[in-house]
């Protein structure tokens, strides 16, 4: 829970980065597009799923549902920032500089969020199945920041039991 609360604070900072980027690019960050409404709906649905799980009275199950919801959100968030990074690689001039600055400000946090959250979710699911889990997960212990690092950490989990 503490891990995800920290991610929330960083995500709010990332939101500020996007709003600033919109301002720099002359875009209204408050414009409601059809796709933005869908994203909002998905986010609200994930929150509702967590609330429903919490009401079920099983704290371990609620924690696992919350973890799965966070993985869904972080996976999409990571993909969006990765896409912004791809555009930043080819953009030039003021646009390129603005995109690169925004991406560089957020990329490391997004990598951390995704790989660590996936590790927590995997280990909590393993624990829920009654199997030995590595808690905190290897990704956390080894403080991985890349996909390769996350893969290596996961491969080492058996030795950490």
Q: What residues fall within each predicted segment?
A:
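Amphipathic alpha-helical hairpins
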Residues: 1-161
